[in-house]
Curated annotation (Swiss-Prot):
Protein family membership: Belongs to the paired homeobox family.
Domain of life: Eukaryota
GO terms, molecular function: DNA-binding transcription factor activity; DNA-binding transcription factor activity, RNA polymerase II-specific; RNA polymerase II cis-regulatory region sequence-specific DNA binding; sequence-specific double-stranded DNA binding
Keywords: Developmental protein, DNA-binding, Homeobox, Nucleus
Cell compartment(s), UniProt: Nucleus
Residue spans binding DNA: 104-163
Protein name (database record): Paired mesoderm homeobox protein 2
Gene Ontology biological-process annotations: regulation of DNA-templated transcription; regulation of transcription by RNA polymerase II
Originating organism: Homo sapiens
Biased composition (Basic and acidic residues): 61-70
Tissues showing expression: In fetal skin, highest expression found in cells of mesodermal origin within the dermal papilla of the developing hair shaft. Not detected in epidermis or dermis. In adult skin, weakly expressed within the basal layers of the epidermis. Not expressed in dermis.
Residue stretches of biased makeup (Basic residues): 97-108
Compositional bias segments (type: Pro residues): 16-26
Name of encoding gene: PRRX2
Principal subcellular localisation of the protein: nucleus
Length: 253
């Protein structure tokens, strides 16, 4: 009995903590599916977590991780910002953003003299030609219908600018002429004439006389009033002399 029990105990495996079971092997399809899910689910963050796990498994990994974290801010931007890493799907918005930044330059159309004459002739008739007129004109001048339509749009804008400038200049000229006419028609008050100092001194000396005193040495031109006063004074003087002379002559009886 003892030998049989001992043999049974030797055949039974010993119970205790053993090594973990190995991971299941993945085929090529499983690897592709795992890589696809990996790239969609924030590739960069998951790679950092896996790298941190591998560093923790090695001795001295914490010191190396600290040194790498200290060098990363001073070293500049990470490689993930400069270029996509291996396995990262390129963003579809990068190419479109670069294309939007490069603004396409539109080719300008140069019209010759014959084309401009034909376009101006039609513009004199109508400022808004319909599609049939534009197509016919485009065939005549060897241009596209879109170019003809753009030319008419620009020509209408230029015509409106010229009209506004003409109206502004005309209104300014009318306002200027009206202000000049109003200034001419406004009555002007007569200015008082300045009195000469000779007249003021004469009125102060003889207030009752209306004729200024005659001065023989004056070189000014004689006025009619002054001549009349002089003649009256001379006549009076002669009459007085005649009366004196007649009174002195003795009478004969």
């Amino acid at each position: 009995m003892d030998s049989a029990a001992a043999a049974f105990a030797l055949d039974k495996p010993a119970l205790g903590p053993g090594p973990p079971p190995p991971p299941p092997a993945l085929g090529p399809g499983d690897c592709a599916q795992a890589r696809k899910n990996f790239s969609v689910s924030h590739l960069l963050d998951l790679e950092e977590v896996a790298a941190a796990g591998r560093l923790a498994a090695r001795p001295g990994a914490r010191a190396e991780a600290r040194e790498g974290a200290a060098r990363e801010p001073s070293g500049g931007s990470s490689g993930s910002e400069a270029a996509p890493q291996d396995g990262e799907c390129p963003s579809p918005g990068r190419g479109s953003a670069a294309k939007r930044k490069k603004k396409q330059r539109r080719n300008r159309t140069t019209f010759n003299s014959s084309q401009l004459q034909a376009l101006e002739r039609v513009f004199e008739r109508t400022h808004y030609p319909d599609a049939f007129v534009r197509e016919e004109l485009a065939r005549r001048v060897n241009l596209s219908e879109a170019r003809v339509q753009v030319w008419f749009q620009n020509r209408r804008a230029k015509f409106r600018r010229n009209e506004r400038a003409m109206l502004a200049s005309r209104s300014a000229s009318l306002l200027k002429s009206y202000s000049q006419e109003a200034a001419i028609e406004q009555p002007v008050a007569p200015r008082p004439t300045a009195l000469s100092p000779d007249y003021l001194s004469w009125t102060a000396s003889s207030p009752y006389s209306t004729v200024p005193p005659y001065s023989p040495g004056s070189s000014g031109p004689a006025t009619p009033g002054v001549n009349m006063a002089n003649s009256i004074a001379s006549l009076r003087l002669k009459a007085k002399e005649f009366s004196l002379h007649h009174s002195q002559v003795p009478t004969v009886n």
